[in-house]
Amino acid sequence: MASVSAETPASHGHSFSKKTFHKPTYCHSCTDMLWGLIQQGYICEVCNFVVHDRCLKAVVSPCSSIAASLIKNPVAHCWSEQVHRKRKFCNVCRKRLDDNLSVHCEICEYFVHVECQDFAVADCKENATYLPGKDLSAVKHTHHWREGNLPSNSKCALCKKSCFSTECLSGFRCEWCGITLHAYCYKNIPQECTFGNLEPIYLPPHAVSIPRTEVPMEAIIGVQVRRKEVLAREYSCHNIGEQFDFAESEQNGAAGRLAEALRRLSLVLPRSCHGNCHASPPYVRARSISEEFNTDARYRDNGEPVQGTAHGRDPRSPKEKEEKERGDEEMIKVYDGNNSLRRRIFRVISVPRQATTEQVLTSALRAFHITKDPTDFYLTDLYASDETELCDPTPILNLNRKEGKRPAVFLRFKNKDSGEVRVYPGKLQISESFCIVPVTEATTVADSINEALEKFGLQNFNCDDYRCSEILLDRGVTERVLSWDERPWDIVKQLGKDSIRQMELMRFYLQLKQDPHGPNLALFVGNLPPNLSERSYENMLTEFLGKENRFSSIGPIYYEYGSMVIIYEDSNKAVRALYALRESKYEDKHLLVMLLPSIEPSMVPAGVQPLLVFVNVKSGGCQGLQLISSFRKLLNPYQVFDLDNGGPLPGLYVFRHIKDYKILVCGGDGTIGWVLQCLDNVGQDSECSSPACAIVPLGTGNDLARVLCWGSGYTGDEDPLNLLRDVIDAEEIILDRWTVVFHTEEKEQTQVVCNAAGAGSTSEDNTQIYVMNNYFGIGVDADLCLDFHNAREENPNKFKSRLRNKGVYVTMGLRKMVKRKPCKDLHREIRLEVDGKVVELPQVEGIIILNILSWGSGANPWGADTKEDQFYTPNHWDGMLEVVGVTGVIHLGQIQSGLRTAMRIAQGGHIKIHTYSDLPVQVDGEPWIQSPGDIVVLKSALKATMLKKSKIKRRNTEPSILPSNGEGGKSTDE
């Protein structure tokens, strides 16, 4: 095959060669089929990019071997769990994911095989780019392009033709605004991005800052897939002697690096960890063999692999491999340094037995995606006694061999006295991606900073205001701040001995010493005991942290929820506190700790109302995980919060300084009540005390969502993009809210409250106060609700389907029909007053007080208005409540089926009920048994601003984020 790399533009980095394809193959540039019998097109020998002869000079996709070097600000991906995925392509090797395990980024549309994960490019969306002192008018946001895996309805924004392909990885999509393009139209589109249709609710990255710490992004935003056993494995530590060869460390002068590694490890890992980290970056524990290069190797008792696979997986059958080894080609294991040998991690290359040293070296470099000059490297025989260098004329035949083992070689970096290093400007306002700085063994970091500042045109700035970091792009992004007297060339050479691949992925990063986030780092701490004093909370945290990790100040304390915010001015101390508190327990329950981002409100453009998204992943049908993943891709992930991590309070704290924003609550009626209750508690401390709230109904009943036209329940077929567009178009309305006061007669009797989310405040005179949004029930309705609640509490895993939940309700109702009726003659057990007048009750087994005209999953107990009706037409903002009665379980079923309505009893704005015995009650679906006493329902001073969905019909013509099943979604209005 003839190489054509010299004939094509070098900017893309591909190594193209002519190839004859024996099955239908498609061009990755124009997506047309390659026609012909032999040598139909070209293929990159590294990343498998296929291209027509006519498209060769129009290639814009960089090869995966150089893609990492093109990134100015690397951002690590947040990887999902390993799954089998259909109709997707790997962004590294460009092959289908169908038959192999793969992972994808939870923030962007980046998909890779598990075997290709080491070569994944750390180019996730940069979601926090705030720079102090930069004016909003000077901010220009650019597109963030992702190649391939486009939605099926994608059309090119330039030529308006379809740019979707099922045959290959092709086309581009902006991760911010969602526009899609052909590869050949990619260069002709303006680079400035305005976030597309979602601009009115998008939290712009230039308004967000996160502390400059080593805490991974997934730990900040609360990605669910990396918790429990995964986190336990990542932060577990073993014997440090297993990973360090101390004799070698002393010989190489690495004792200082070992001490630095241990010091840094104490900053990142919990106190319970006592062990190993690398002698070179990244300074975390050594990854296991299965985690490193994923060679799919099998091991004998002595630990030697029987076989390995090259990058991209070898599709040949065992028989074909055996025939090839007997033929003219040799399979050779390649280790890229001492670390790979120590962990027995290798790559396999296939070369002709008569290959020259140059050919073998080229194949070895290509296997590890090394793009540096081949003359800087050499190969040595692993099994030779003195590690002999390979030389012509027959290097393969001269290799030493061991019985039962393949020949193996070391890929080594030549020991030079001088060289060049790349210095990247990071977030400095520089147009160049990097500069080349010549270094020698005597060059220090301070010298390199001065040289880099001069090349970037910043020679007039003070060198002392800057720092230089060592950045590794191996399986994420790892940073180590360098001291001024360290020598960059020594770092490069030491890294070359340990791992050529790590040396290739290492870069020096110039940045200001001052953290753009500012001196204050906020930690949210939850799962503390509720209703303690500030001094008690302070003493408790000091005991957990110790005096050395004590916080600088205390932020808001949410006494009712047992949560608070603590402030640090030292980032290292904050990280130590984060992990120390995560290891701490109170009453056998781990504390919940989150490092919170910060939002600069002055950087939010006028007319933009950022959307704060809350998702309850445990609600009703449990579609929350799918939704939260889609919203993190469509929006800034720092505006999307999982209610399983601290509830609504962390998100409300982060948004407290924004003057105008909206809220989207994804959950059931109980979740909406939870968010509104938290808003009541923090509203007085926020710039926006009553943000408008929209709903994605995930619960079983979803009565408030029905009234506000958000639907009966999210099914998973709706396009998340259309849900967000509905929020933008929704109209604001006012929802009346009501205070329900319970005062029991027997002070010594304990009240049972079943759900903390609906818990009201309790005073010393045995009075409890709740806020009602939807309805309040006494009698048979509440009794049925209580039975369902108790069953779900006993076994929550059985109540993950909305349909099953409704089936359980029906089953329990049928049982109530044949059992003793606990609420019989309810009209004799209570006295009802409406607006100061006693109302005579008919013979009922339950009464329901309605604020909205939806109850029990969409039923309307009040019914339609008639001309001779003595009552006013009700709505949810008129300051009136409707009181209806039900005669039994059969009547409840008839109401839910639409055959009957409830008995209209009264209508008013102030209701008082006196109960003479223990009765089941429920407020907004949260039930318990209430002792005898007085119940007063009065209008609350707290009103909620809600968003009502506008009935707009849309055509499903815009590309969308695909659900996890890989299939396109439908419009919400279809």
Positions of predicted regions on the chain:
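Cys/His-rich zinc-coordinating "finger" modules and their low-complexity flanking regions
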Residues: M1-K319, D328-N338, I345-R347, P530, ...
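Surface-exposed beta-strand-to-loop junctions
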Residues: S3-S11, A68-N73, G133-V139, K333-R343, ...
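Beta-strand elements of modular eukaryotic interaction domains
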Residues: A6, F16-K18, T31-W35, G41-I43, ...
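Short amphipathic alpha-helical segments embedded in low-complexity Lys/Glu-rich regions
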Residues: Y42-F49, V60-S69, V103-F111, V121-Y130, ...
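ATP/NTP phosphate-donor binding region
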Residues: N153, A157, L203, A207, ...
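Intrinsically disordered, proline/Ser/Thr-rich N-terminal regulatory segments
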Residues: A207, V215-N450, E454-H517
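ATP/nucleoside-binding phosphotransfer catalytic cores, i.e., glycine-rich phosphate-binding loops
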Residues: C237, G241, A247, Y579, ...
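Catalytic core of DAGKc-family lipid kinases
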Residues: G607, L612-S629, L634-Y661, T671-S854
